[in-house]
Structure formats: C-alpha cells, structure tokens
Regions:
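Long, basic/Gly/Ser/Thr-rich N-terminal segments
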Residues: 1-2
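Phosphate-binding loop of NTP-binding sites
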Residues: 7-13, 20-128
C-alpha cells in the first residue's frame, strides 16, 4: 500500500492499527469509522499481541530512553532471557528496533506522546 486512501480498506480487515500521526480526517480513518471496523492504537496492539502475559519493563525519563532500553534488552538477551522489545531506535546488537522473543519480558520506551487521535493519553498508560 502506498499512501492513505480509503481503497486500502476495501478488503475489510479484522483489525486496523492506527498510528499517532494519523488525524481524524485521514481518509482511512474516516473509512474505518463508516465501515464499523475494529481498530486500536499501536500501544494497545503491542499490549494485546506482544506484551500480554509478559512482564513489561518500561523505561521513561527526559533523556536516554532509547539507549537505556537498548542496554536493558541486550542485558536480558545476554542473560539468556530471550526478551521482546519495541524501541524507538535501531539497536546495533540486534539490527532492529523490535524483537519478538519467547522470554518473560517485554522492554518498551515509556514516553508522554499521545496514543492516537481517539486517545490523547500517553502511550505508556497502555502497559501495566
């Protein structure tokens, strides 16, 4: 798919994940509302499909969240704990910003940015 167009939802997906950069007037947001499709924010999806059943380790603060989250994920990996993570930057040790591990931990950055146009609460409130 290239760009935001209502035709992108013509196949009626089971769930639409809406990013925080999408505005209410976005053609796909309007279409999913008119079609009555199920939707959620990225933090809600991560909590439901990735973090569910895992212990969430949230790193917050003014500076250094990406670095600290990356170090924490690497320590857990090196300890043999096979962590999952979703981090704002690309981790050099993993060559990715996300990983779906089988271990008991999910590492995520906790920032104060809003979740989506339909949820102005901070993203970190979706992880408990």
């Amino acid at each position: 798919m290239d760009g935001f167009r209502e035709e992108n939802l013509s196949y009626a997906p089971d769930l639409v994940i809406v990013g925080n950069a999408v505005v209410r007037e976005n053609p796909e947001a309007v279409k999913l509302h008119h079609m009555g499709l199920n939707f959620c924010s990225m933090p809600q999806a991560l909590n439901r499909f990735v973090a569910g059943g895992k212990t969430t380790l949230m790193v917050s603060g003014t500076h250094g969240k990406t670095t600290t989250s990356s170090i924490l994920a690497w320590i857990l990996h090196e300890a043999g704990l096979d962590p999952s993570f979703m981090i704002g930057g690309i981790l050099k040790n993993f060559d990715s910003n996300y990983r779906l591990g089988n271990g008991p931990y999910f590492v995520v950055e906790g920032d104060e940015y809003d979740t989506a146009f339909f949820d102005k609460g901070p993203k970190f409130m979706h992880f408990r």
